[in-house]
């Protein structure tokens, strides 16, 4: 939906009248001669699920805490990556790296060839296929679950493929550090 200047902070409704987000900003671009900014008609909103999680924390303590596992991956789990890792399909969240002092350091394995400049695709990393029994189709599913359905200090059960074998590991979710 187009958001005009001055609408930031207002609710974004769906056709049923439900609040689905809070308008946050608009995309502006130089659309007129002379470089005068104009509204491109593209708006960005904070999803209601994020607002519902953050606002009570801000009211209570003045800051929001976010969960994290301390892993690296991307939403680009390709067919080539799956084949290189002896998997039938690119389904799940591929763990490319694990932060050495992060929450998942003892439980998950990252790719073994990330330092190899000649490596075409990462190999050897775990693939997370479920968290607490919820299927994970890609890294974005994992990020959303961790951010919106967990709290720092909570244990989560991860179903992983490691070397082609399915197993379960438990990780205590950490609190994402500030990036001041």
Language-model region placement:
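C-terminal recognition in membrane/secretory proteostasis and scaffolding
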Residues: 14-19, 53-180
């Amino acid at each position: 939906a187009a958001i005009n200047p001055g609408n930031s902070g207002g609710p974004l409704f769906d056709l049923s009248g439900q609040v689905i987000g809070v308008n946050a900003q608009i995309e502006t671009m130089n659309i007129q001669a002379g470089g005068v900014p104009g509204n491109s008609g593209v708006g960005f909103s904070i999803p209601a699920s994020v607002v519902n999680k953050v606002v009570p924390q801000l009211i209570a303590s003045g800051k929001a805490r976010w969960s994290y596992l301390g892993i690296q991956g991307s939403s680009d789990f390709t067919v080539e990556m799956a084949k290189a890792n002896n998997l039938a399909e690119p389904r799940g969240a591929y763990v490319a790296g694990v932060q050495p002092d992060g929450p998942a350091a003892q439980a998950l394995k990252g790719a073994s060839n990330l330092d190899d400049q000649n490596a075409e695709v990462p190999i050897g990393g775990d693939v997370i296929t479920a968290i607490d029994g919820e299927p994970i189709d890609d890294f974005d599913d994992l990020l959303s679950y961790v951010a919106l359905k967990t709290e720092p200090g909570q244990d989560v059960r991860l179903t992983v493929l490691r070397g082609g074998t399915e197993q379960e590991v438990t990780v205590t979710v950490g609190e994402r550090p500030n990036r001041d």
